[in-house]
Design a protein with these regions (language model features):
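Core beta-strand-centered patch of the WYL/Sm-like small regulatory domain
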Residues: 1-88
Length: 88
């Protein structure tokens, strides 16, 4: 199952999920999110969700989600960090 399918299922079933997320700067963190919806402002490649650990709503780019509930999704792409491009 692709990550988009897992996210879509979580949106439809209103599930709380644990994600591992890589920020644009390359920092990786894990958090629980709930109340997940697709972002109307940023389009279908982003979700809006409530982070339970910091008790705030946040926007997440779907392609930066590396794991959902412990399941890894391998993606090979180039990510620009600063002035350098790094393979992730």
């Amino acid at each position: 199952m692709a990550i988009e399918e897992v996210i879509d299922r979580a949106v439809q079933l209103r599930q709380t999920i644990e994600i591992e997320y890589c920020t644009r700067s390359g920092r990786v963190f894990t958090c629980l999110i709930s109340d997940i919806i697709y972002s109307r402002y940023y389009g279908g490649q982003y979700i809006l969700a409530y982070r339970l650990d910091i008790k705030e709503e946040r926007t997440f780019k779907i392609s930066r989600i590396q794991k959902v509930n412990g399941h890894s999704f391998s993606r090979i792409f180039w990510n620009q960090i600063g002035d350098n491009f790094n393979r992730i």
